[in-house]
């Protein structure tokens, strides 16, 4: 099993994407397509929250066609980040993080 490592910067956050194709021969045999694994981790700042994960780390499995239709691991993750960054919850969290807290 090969592993691809992709490094990107999104909104000033350095992010590592690990992509492992075809992680389960049993899945491929049962469903006729490979099951791929994606890991996304914010590196700098370390474990910085992202619109797709509050902890700065995400690990999920996807059928190969999802990865391919998204344009590959990097394009797919960038599209997710941009899409979920438009959510009202993410926008509110970003505003809150930028404001000073006088009581802590």
Regions found by a protein language model. Name each.
Residues 1-34:
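Amphipathic, interaction-prone secondary-structure segments
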């Amino acid at each position: 099993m090969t592993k691809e490592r992709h490094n990107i910067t999104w909104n000033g956050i350095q992010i590592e994407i690990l992509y492992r194709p075809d992680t389960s021969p049993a899945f491929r045999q049962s469903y006729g397509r490979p099951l791929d694994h994606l890991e996304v981790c914010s590196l700098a700042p370390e474990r910085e929250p992202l619109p797709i994960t509050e902890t700065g780390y995400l690990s999920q499995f996807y059928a190969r066609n999802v990865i391919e239709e998204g344009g590959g691991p990097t394009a797919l993750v960038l599209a997710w980040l941009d899409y979920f960054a438009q959510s009202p919850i993410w926008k509110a969290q970003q505003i809150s993080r930028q404001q000073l807290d006088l009581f802590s």
